Amino acid sequence: MTECFLPPTSSPSEHRRAEHGSGLTRTPSSEEISPTKFPELYRTGEPSPPHDILHEPPDIVSDDEKDHGKKKGKFKKKEKRTEGYVAFQEDSSGDEAESPSKMKRSKGIHVFKKPSFSKKKEKDFKIKEKPKEEKHKEEKHKEEKHKEKKCKDFTAADVVKQWKEKKKKKKPTQEPEVPQTDAPSLRPIFGAPFADAVERTMMYDGIRLPAVFRECVDYMEKHGMKCEGIYRVSGIKSKVDELKAAYDREESPNLEEYEPNTVASLLKQYLRDLPENLLTKELMPRFEEACGRTTEVEKVQEFQRLLRELPEYNHLLLSWLIVHMDHVIAKELETKMNIQNISIVLSPTVQISNRVLYVLFTHVQELFGTVLLKQVTRPLRWSNMATMPTLPETQAGIKEEIRRQEFLLNCLHRDLQGGIKDFSKEERLWEVQRILTALKRKLREAKRQECETKIAQEIASLSKEDVSKEETNENEEVINILLAQENEILTEQEELLAMEQFLRRQIASEKEEIDRLRAEIAEIQSRQHGRSETEEYSSDSESESEDEEELQIILEDLQRQNEELEIKNNHLNQAVHEEREAIVELRVQLRLLQMLRAKSEQQLQEEEEPERRGGTGPLPCEGVLEVRAAKEQAKPSPSKDRKETPI
């Protein structure tokens, strides 16, 4: 195939046309435009049929572009092609605007016909304007090329800046807003008013200080007195934030797992977040004025008077803080913290000037001599159900732990009744109830053991005396203790026997129900087996596999639901068991009270009878018989007054 291009303006054909005159045009011969004279005008290729469709002109490639042509892709070649057409259009339009003679010459070239050319190929030489879409594409390609050149010169900072600008331009998709409910949520402890924090996290011993302050001071008294630069060296921020979040959730983290500097930073953070000054805005100027007194006695007296005017919460917190810091200063050899260092650290934290802090630290005994830092005792935990926690051994320790657990139980009930839904608090509630049940049971056992030891001691002391003295001077207190113990044991035994019979009947009914259900299952399986032998299954293997998958999914779902129900059932059974024990205990106490009441009425009647008869008292030997008769009467029979314990 032979392709034809317009010759350049400086070609020999233009010179010939200029020599022949401007008014005449002639058709050039085949020799004048032969390929040997104009090698760039024709390009030989495969021959094409004479009436072929319209072909696009090939790309015009320069020498410089040929060197780099192998490194460029299709996109670069298309750019060159479009640029070549634009240049050709601008040159031709400019020539046409300059002189009409050139237009005529160009018409002459268009009129020229060669036998191998068709009418359709003549259209390739006509200059047409490109549509708007192609112009828009060209401009877009040029902009992209310009951006690529700029991107090569970009640094990392420029790339990050450009990415941020693109991110700002993008509008975030607006998600549908969820209607907010008015459910109460826990407010943070850090930054809360001091009185509010005290009411929410006060310890069981009644000292009106927040738990975070008490526990931090207690930890620092144990582990921070040998740490160099304590309160000056900051702790790890991530751990401090972790502890802060735990206290904001009203939890009690184990500070033993953290370093002293971390706990010290937590304490400073709490003091820094207090919404009000410890010395209050009204009294702060007066404290500053008191520092300017001439004598130390006047300073101390004025400070004592101003401290009495402080609110109760502020005075208590300030006294504990100053006494604790005085302990740190006393360990200056280990901590390397003297009055000046502590004042520099504490002044911006609590917003108190160095002058006031210096007076407080130098007169601790006169101002806070009666303050004693009481150690914190954590309530007992029972997080692992597989192991039993170590309970106190003495009655005093058990009673103290019961007070702690009851205080914690009341706090949990208050939070849950306030509408705050917290699964961890619900679990802690069950845990506290289990601990209380175990503690009360152990307290009863301790009282019983103490009573038995006391009785054994009394019996041992009485065995040394004569039999006659034992009969006449028998200790009424020991008899009463024995009777009370015997009555309590017998009544408790009766209640437990009644509960045992009730549980046995319930177990028997459950076994019958299990046997009935097993029989029904066996009958259903036999029916299905017989039906499978008589029926013919014509379903495809694909439908059977799908049914099996659906049945497997349903089975897994049912198993998961069954596990959840078993867990709930275990919790309910445990709660029912604990309630039954409490009911048995109450019934025993009720029956004991009834027995004591009947015994007191009987004694009153016996005392009234001798008075009616003339004041004749019973013989000494009759006293022993009456005591033994009272023992036999106080013993309840196992078959009498037996009641079943309902669920």
Swiss-Prot record:
Ubiquitously expressed. Its EC number is 7.6.2.2, 7.6.2.3. GO terms for biological process: cell division; doxorubicin transport; endocytosis; negative regulation of smooth muscle cell proliferation; positive regulation of mitochondrial fission; positive regulation of oxidative stress-induced neuron intrinsic apoptotic signaling pathway; positive regulation of protein phosphorylation; receptor-mediated endocytosis. Keywords: Acetylation, ATP-binding, Cell cycle, Cell division, Cell membrane, Cytoplasm, Cytoskeleton, GTPase activation, Membrane, Mitochondrion, Mitosis, Nucleotide-binding, Nucleus, Phosphoprotein, Translocase, Transport. It catalyses: an S-substituted glutathione(in) + ATP + H2O = an S-substituted glutathione(out) + ADP + phosphate + H(+); ATP + H2O + xenobioticSide 1 = ADP + phosphate + xenobioticSide 2; leukotriene C4(in) + ATP + H2O = leukotriene C4(out) + ADP + phosphate + H(+). Residues 403-499 are annotated as: Mediates interaction with RALA and RALB. One of its GO terms (cellular component) is plasma membrane. Residues 102-119 are annotated as: Nuclear localization signal. Tyrosine-phosphorylated upon stimulation of cells with EGF. May undergo proteolytic cleavage to give peptides which reassemble to form a transporter complex. Residues 69-79, 102-118 have a biased composition (Basic residues). It is an enzyme of class 7 (translocase). One of its GO terms (molecular function) is GTPase activator activity. Residues 1-151, 163-186, 525-550, 601-647 are annotated as: Disordered. Multifunctional protein that functions as a downstream effector of RALA and RALB. As a GTPase-activating protein/GAP can inactivate CDC42 and RAC1 by stimulating their GTPase activity. As part of the Ral signaling pathway, may also regulate ligand-dependent EGF and insulin receptors-mediated endocytosis. During mitosis, may act as a scaffold protein in the phosphorylation of EPSIN/EPN1 by the mitotic kinase cyclin B-CDK1, preventing endocytosis during that phase of the cell cycle. During mitosis, also controls mitochondrial fission as an effector of RALA. Could also function as a primary ATP-dependent active transporter for glutathione conjugates of electrophiles. May also actively catalyze the efflux of a wide range of substrates including xenobiotics like doxorubicin (DOX) contributing to cell multidrug resistance. The Rho-GAP domain mediates the GTPase activator activity toward CDC42. This is RalA-binding protein 1. It comes from Rattus norvegicus.
